[in-house]
Amino acid sequence: MVIGIIGESCTGKSTLADKLKILLNAESYAGKDYLRLAKSETIAKKIFQKKLDEATYGLHIIYVISEKEYLQLLPKQAIRVLVTAELDTIKERFAKRMHGNLPAPVASMLERKHGCFDSEIHDIHVKSGQSDLDEVCISIQNIISRKTGQMPCIED
């Protein structure tokens, strides 16, 4: 099953992906990670698209998306998890990534992009700081079970 974890930077997508990767024994990709599949971007994208299409009812693949252009790679049957956070939270986390300094142009960019995924179709909405990730993982497992008719592969 393909699980698309969608949202702006610094909303908690990677934290959720890391937890799911272990729980589901899944492969995980983010953004243009698929480029490691081939030397040519065009070929790598085709290989990745095929891999996602084949994983719809087999191996679990988590795809972390923070740019809208990559949404088109998700198969129709993928589980879509929208992860959001308050703008102040995003700015605070982004500043930590930049060693405590958030330049004004970066803050402006975050403000412009804030909410850009909010209208995207999703199966689950995770609100950073409000949603319990263990409960989110259980919900995702339940969706996998419903869509595939079988229990997901869970690591002990």
Can you describe what each PLM-predicted range is?
Residues 5:
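Hydrophobic anchor at the beta1->P-loop junction of P-loop NTPases
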Residues 8:
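P-loop (Walker A) phosphate-binding loop of NTP-binding proteins
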Residues 11:
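ATP-binding Walker
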Residues 14:
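Walker A/P-loop
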Residues 17-58:
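Conserved substrate/cofactor phosphate-moiety recognition/catalytic segment
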Residues 74-94:
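Conserved phosphate-donor/acceptor-positioning beta-strand/loop module used by diverse small-molecule
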